[in-house]
């Protein structure tokens, strides 16, 4: 066999190995076995003497992008260990796209900080596809340059684990809102201490909170550019609503309520059996769907309402009022609702009066109805209107603010 045939066979073996490494799952412990295979290719092609005395030609070596892809399958600490294999491998791990960084893996917080500063150096241009970051209760100001690096390297998936006493750093919230390609955000809530998690993003496709207590408060605002519900979008909303169905306190904006209404036209809403408190903003045109939504909250105790003041809600015609009239009475009004509050000042418009009438006439458990009047409204005139409404509850107190 001449030298040309040997070379051809070696290159074929290298390409075959490269293909198998890309498409086949594998587990690696300790030293990266791809490095060993790289040496074996040459050893199998030439005699042992040649292998010992001849430097491996570049054409027999696996390319750096493939080696980096291999390192992406390793735990970060194992990928770092490959830096001792040779001079060539010394910095390869710095180009991995998937990273797991936990302060508990380091001997001290300073060691953790030093490593992060080194890896997230602003001059490095490699992309970060996925990052799992475990934080402790130290001052989080050190995260700012790291966050800048995340945005610069177009991070797509972020998993944050917060230990007891550690609050979500404000810089991470800025990352969510400023990173144009972030698609997945997961937060492990190890310890609930009344913390608030606010997420605002145009690119986020997945937001996961784990180990969250059922009495956590949810404030959700979801918007879609088009009210077109294909199978994928319907499935996503279904999973989201099912996931939050155990919360006890929820805030919903008008757009989110409209979204839920459109969803409920084709799929039955889940039961929010644990929810006792609801803060909701409504548009007058959506009032007729409100009782349908309340049917899914059978144990609601406290309700705070905000009516959106749009041109259409100010000028509802008698026919429009009839179309949005509310007839059905959900279970919560009959058995659990005790407190209703109109958060925005009311001035006697048809949608507002219709809701006031609805709660007073249909809820035997209602204890307090709180109303705010606009300055030009007189209390006496409004009281006269209220007196004409039959009350289902003999204990209901109407409060004017």
Curated annotation (Swiss-Prot):
<feature type="repeat" description="LRR 1">
    <location>
        <begin position="128"/>
        <end position="152"/>
    </location>
</feature>
<dbReference type="InterPro" id="IPR001810">
    <property type="entry name" value="F-box_dom"/>
</dbReference>
<feature type="domain" description="FBD">
    <location>
        <begin position="321"/>
        <end position="373"/>
    </location>
</feature>
<dbReference type="InterPro" id="IPR006566">
    <property type="entry name" value="FBD"/>
</dbReference>
<dbReference type="Pfam" id="PF08387">
    <property type="entry name" value="FBD"/>
</dbReference>
<dbReference type="InterPro" id="IPR053781">
    <property type="entry name" value="F-box_AtFBL13-like"/>
</dbReference>
<keyword id="KW-0677">Repeat</keyword>
<feature type="domain" description="F-box">
    <location>
        <begin position="56"/>
        <end position="102"/>
    </location>
</feature>
<keyword id="KW-0433">Leucine-rich repeat</keyword>
<dbReference type="InterPro" id="IPR036047">
    <property type="entry name" value="F-box-like_dom_sf"/>
</dbReference>
<dbReference type="Pfam" id="PF00646">
    <property type="entry name" value="F-box"/>
</dbReference>
<dbReference type="InterPro" id="IPR050232">
    <property type="entry name" value="FBL13/AtMIF1-like"/>
</dbReference>
<feature type="repeat" description="LRR 2">
    <location>
        <begin position="275"/>
        <end position="296"/>
    </location>
</feature>
<protein>
    <recommendedName>
        <fullName>Putative F-box/FBD/LRR-repeat protein At3g23955</fullName>
    </recommendedName>
</protein>
